[in-house]
């Protein structure tokens, strides 16, 4: 609850570092404190790792530049030695060509393939150091045949369905095929969980358009991505992904080391503040903390700092102009998207206080977010899941209304009374209202602009006429 008051919108749980029982405890605790807080679970994803170091070497094996080793595939049972480095992918030798670079432990060690046989790769150390058990391996620019969903991922996805989770952040997504594999599991259980694809490797970048199309949202996970790409390439890569996501009406999250020094320090570095600010200037939907809140000494201060930076940057009205003229994917063929654009345009040209909408699924709220309007979108949700998923959308404040209404005028008046509990309204306040047809087809069907007094007066006239 302290995190929520400081500005947290979503709780993320990384399945790579927690058991199912531990994750269940986290979810139950969060929803006991506040049922409206969404939960995102990260899958571990398909990874290449060095196997366990043989006991005779202790905790690590030291290699120097120029040392040669054989690399072989394994089911994980073989132990790595000074002569043979085993990796947990049985077919790895088949997929990696001579000349390929292999980065171990986030690039702390690097080997290059100089020879290849049917059974092994002969590799030479380009960057030496201490190799430890279970360290990650990246192979830039090489496509390796890995499963879309590991057995552990499958168990956690099924756990997520049973435990009222809202988002699955799938790790190391390489193509739309990986997302479809997760979606098939969700569909088999009739789940509404939304998939966030984590972009962490070159293959994911190469297929970014199809990944965006197949996903609910995107996370730019700069840690592993920074291993495969040169550091100087990350800012432009991040910016291009953000632009593509906004055009496709997909929420986009920036993650990894945003306030990393706050793991040990109560204050961030100036460079970290600038990093957070840059992401906000790019108009991302969310910025994310990892180690800062998972294992840091100053978790509450980290959340408060990030929220404070975001509020300060968003005061810059000269930069944060609505994106109503952008060429957005499919917008010309979707009534909801056109009405959302009209509402944001009106809120730009008129002294509108809030954009107000009612939504069952959250789709209209997501479309309004895509146009990046300056005015807060107050989304009246009739389902808890819709309220939770809209917490990840730009500029949207989702609030839950348990009672669903069935006509336009009752919705307007009821929404005003309900919103007045959250944001005090004045009679002269002008609102842009985006509503649905209240019929079986769903979706937005009208935009109305009116002040609070006129809406209330009109409703009184309708009620009086109904009594006659």
Q: What are these model-derived regions, one by one?
A:
Residues 364-366, 372-411:
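Nucleotide-binding motor/catalytic cores of P-loop/tubulin-like NTPases across gene-expression machines
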Residues 2-3:
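Short, small-residue-biased leader/transition segments that mark boundaries at the very start
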Residues 9-20, 169-172, 218-229, 276-299:
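Glycine-rich phosphate-binding active-site loops on the catalytic face of alpha/beta enzymes
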Residues 180, 196, 305-343, 460-467:
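Long, charged amphipathic helices and adjacent flexible linkers at domain junctions
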Residues 28, 45, 50-157, 397-400, ...:
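Beta-strand/loop-dominated core regions that host nucleotide or nucleotide-derived cofactor-binding catalytic loops
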């Amino acid at each position: 609850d302290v995190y929520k008051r400081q500005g947290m919108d979503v709780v993320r749980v990384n399945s790579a570092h927690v058991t199912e029982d531990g994750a269940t405890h986290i979810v139950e605790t969060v929803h006991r404190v506040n049922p409206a807080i969404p939960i995102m679970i990260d899958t571990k994803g398909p990874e290449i790792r060095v196997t366990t170091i043989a006991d005779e070497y202790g905790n690590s094996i030291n290699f120097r530049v120029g040392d040669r080793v054989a690399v072989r595939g394994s089911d994980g049972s073989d132990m790595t030695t000074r002569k043979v480095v085993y990796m947990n992918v049985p077919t790895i030798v088949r997929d990696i060509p001579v000349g390929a670079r292999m980065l171990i432990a986030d690039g702390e060690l690097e080997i290059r393939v100089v020879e290849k046989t049917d059974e092994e790769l002969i590799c030479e150390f380009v960057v030496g150091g201490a190799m430890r058990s279970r360290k990650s391996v990246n192979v830039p620019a090489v496509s390796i045949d890995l499963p879309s969903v590991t057995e552990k991922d499958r168990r956690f996805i099924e756990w997520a369905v049973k435990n009222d989770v809202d988002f699955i952040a799938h790790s190391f997504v390489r193509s739309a095929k990986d997302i479809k594999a997760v979606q098939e599991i969700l569909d088999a259980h009739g789940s509404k969980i939304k998939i966030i694809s984590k972009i962490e490797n070159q293959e994911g970048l190469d297929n970014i358009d199809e990944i965006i199309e197949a996903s609910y949202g995107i996370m730019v996970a700069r840690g592993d991505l920074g291993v495969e790409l040169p550091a100087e390439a990350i800012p432009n890569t991040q910016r291009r992904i953000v632009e593509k996501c906004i055009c496709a009406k997909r929420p986009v999250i920036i993650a990894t080391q945003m306030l990393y020094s706050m793991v040990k320090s109560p204050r961030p570095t100036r460079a970290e503040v600038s990093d957070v600010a840059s992401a906000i200037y790019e108009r991302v939907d969310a910025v994310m903390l990892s180690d800062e809140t998972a294992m840091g000494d100053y978790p509450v201060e980290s959340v408060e700092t990030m929220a404070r930076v975001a509020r300060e940057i968003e005061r810059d009205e000269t930069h944060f102009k609505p994106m109503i003229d952008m060429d957005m994917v499919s917008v010309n063929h979707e009534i909801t998207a056109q009405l959302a654009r009209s509402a944001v345009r009106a809120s730009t040209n008129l002294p509108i206080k809030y954009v107000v909408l009612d939504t069952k699924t959250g789709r209209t709220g997501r479309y309004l977010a895509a146009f990046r309007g300056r005015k807060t979108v107050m989304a009246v949700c009739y389902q808890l899941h819709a309220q939770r998923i809209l917490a990840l959308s730009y500029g949207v404040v989702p609030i839950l209304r348990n009672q669903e209404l069935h006509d336009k005028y009752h919705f307007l008046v009821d929404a005003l009374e309900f919103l007045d509990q959250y944001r005090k309204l004045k009679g002269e306040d002008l609102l842009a209202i985006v509503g649905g047809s209240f019929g079986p087809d769903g979706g937005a069907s009208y935009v109305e602009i009116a002040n609070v007094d006129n809406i209330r007066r009109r409703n009184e006239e309708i009620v009086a006429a109904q009594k006659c």
